[in-house]
Amino acid sequence: MHEKYKKQLLILTGMSGAGKTVAAHSLEDVGYFVVDNLPPELLGNFWDLMNTSEDFEKVAVVIDLRVKSFYKDLIDEINSLEDSGQTQATIVFLEASDDTLVARYKETRRLPPLAENGRLLDGIRDERRILTPVRNRSNYILDTSKMTTKELKQKLQSKFGELHKPKFGIEVMSFGFKYGMPIDADIVMDVRFLPNPFYIPELRPFTGLDKRVFNYVMDKDETKVFYGKLLDLLLTAIPGYIDEGKEKLTIAIGCTGGQHRSVSIAQQLARDLSEKYPVDITHREISRYLRK
């Protein structure tokens, strides 16, 4: 990227079906403000607008053959922008082999922009020919034929994400099944099989935040065995979630009402996981049981 300019402009372009949508999301994840499908003739006005704001230091624009007169207008607009001294654009061009693009289009049941009468290969070849001038002008050319989505994301983020590294965090949530499962949970553990303080009259009014309830749940032999295995499982799985680029992992622990067992387990889990990761804890049902 060009360090002399305060704001960075990246133009993401290339063959339809080569992975521009994945690439755009990947750039958003490392701090870029991304605009999709911008007509080339608006590039100059768009950049003027970006320069009026202090909020956007890294900007990416996706431009491809969904807009007409692409090959001519885009190069002209980039040249005009650079000649004015406002910025030095970095052009990233994504491509893939004909066979790969045909396979991807068949999988999605869509057609390339220039395919007429459903002729996939002709449309792909016409697009490749029209985009040649832009490809020749590009700073980076990525062939995604043999890349997985994860590999493309990692390659782009390692190249253009040096100013911003996504932070990983965990939310541990207790809840009650009787009030519905949390729809945003990544991992749900059902602890309704553990001994229930609800049936101990002197513990029933309290929650897992109370030391007596917590100790009752956590000191049971079956809880110790289960919890040890749960913690081992999560410590094994979490690095995989991080490698996949996940920024927030929500672990939900559920019991019947979200009062005793799930709260106790969630408390201990948050405490242990916080030794390695940033952790927030939420007790979804706790307000139902706090003594007024």
UniProtKB/Swiss-Prot annotation:
Residues bound to GTP: 64-67
The UniProt record lists the keyword ATP-binding: yes
Q: Which GO terms describe its molecular function?
A: ATP binding; GTP binding
**Record-listed ATP binding positions:** 14-21
Q: Which UniProt keywords apply?
A: ATP-binding, GTP-binding, Nucleotide-binding
- Gene3D superfamilies cross-referenced by the UniProt entry: P-loop containing nucleotide triphosphate hydrolases
Q: Per UniProt, what is one Pfam family of this protein?
A: PapZ_C
- This protein's record includes keyword Transcription: no
Q: What does this protein do?
A: Displays ATPase and GTPase activities.
What HAMAP family has UniProt attached to this entry? RapZ_like
User: Family assignment?
Assistant: Belongs to the RapZ-like family.
Note the NCBIfam families from the entry: PRK05416.1
Protein's name according to its UniProt entry: Nucleotide-binding protein Ldb0621
In its UniProt entry, the species of origin is given as: Lactobacillus delbrueckii subsp. bulgaricus (strain ATCC 11842 / DSM 20081 / BCRC 10696 / JCM 1002 / NBRC 13953 / NCIMB 11778 / NCTC 12712 / WDCM 00102 / Lb 14)
